[in-house]
Swiss-Prot record:
Methylated by PrmC. Methylation increases the termination efficiency of RF1. It holds the Pfam family PCRF. It is found in: Cytoplasm. This is Peptide chain release factor 1. InterPro entries: PCRF, Pep_chain_release_fac_I, Pep_chain_release_fac_I_sf, Prokaryotic/Mito_RF, RF-1. GO terms for cellular component: cytoplasm. The modification N5-methylglutamine is found at Q230. HAMAP family: Rel_fac_1. Peptide chain release factor 1 directs the termination of translation in response to the peptide chain termination codons UAG and UAA. It comes from the Bacteria. Belongs to the prokaryotic/mitochondrial release factor family. Keywords: Cytoplasm, Methylation, Protein biosynthesis. SUPFAM superfamilies: Release factor (SSF75620).
Amino acid sequence: MLDRLSALEDRYEKLNDLLADPAIIKDTNQLREVSKEQSQLAPTVEVYRVYRDKMEAYQEARHMLTDPEMRDLAKEEVAVLEPEIKDLETKLKALLLPKDPNDDKNVIVEIRGAAGGDEAALFAGDLFKMYSKFAEKQNWKIEIIDASYTELGGYKEIIFIVKGSGAYSKLKYENGAHRVQRVPSTESGGRIHTSTATVAVLPEAEDVEVEIHDKDVRVDTFTSSGPGGQSVNTTQSAVRVTHVPTGIVASCQDEKSQIKNKEKAMKVLRARVYDKIQREQQAEYDEKRKSAVGTGDRSERIRTYNFAQNRVTDHRIGLTIQKLDRILQGEMDEVIDTLVMEYQARASEAAN
């Protein structure tokens, strides 16, 4: 591991030199590629340098244990450094794991009210607000593609793009069924109801990753509608696109322009086709390797939001946090960071 880390540090220094090279600076494409590789290596190199410094201090402290005058002080330093070094080794092993090629991509998120009728649709709206506030804290941008409203202001379905560095790496663990336990605003008897909403997170696919031929796409136009099904546009600006070979459908009615709606719908269609290809490839890989590592099936109930107890429980990793109010305000870091570390640990264990 140390030889590999040393080689990565050498490569990192070489990339820094290239970023100062006038020839690289003039070439926009090359500059972008070098900058991207340098930024990807930076976290690993930074942790490695801290680890190396700690190891040097640890070796020095161990050496001082033979000195009667310094023994007590050295023991204290060794006791402090040992857990720090162990923690850094765990981080380095995780950083050296193969990266998910989709981690730096923008994502398309689809939220749908499931079991629970109007209450499920309202909860879908709460999830959308939670992700919107989390995205704002990450300096990401959100762009709504399509939404189907209920009369009470919830969402039967809402589809949106999250644009920003590392969006997929943090949001990919949100795939699945989210359960809410609370007293609905429409409940006069004060009884707690259980409802669910489903979340799908797809990496945005580029044209070069998924080739969709015009002849394979059927385009239909229709009049866009707003809350309660009311028409909000008398022209047929809403667009529905169908990928005929797979039967995958996407639609958009958020823009007034039919052209813009088609562009957005095609983004969703491309992401869904890309996701289908990836899931088929993963299923084939899992069958061959009997892999148990994954981000959880979408049909799983992955998380429960209990309003009465101000509690959020992630069932995949047994995590319970009594901060529901803050999590719904977008303070999701504790949940997401714990998920990332857990799945990295599982991947590291599977790799060894």
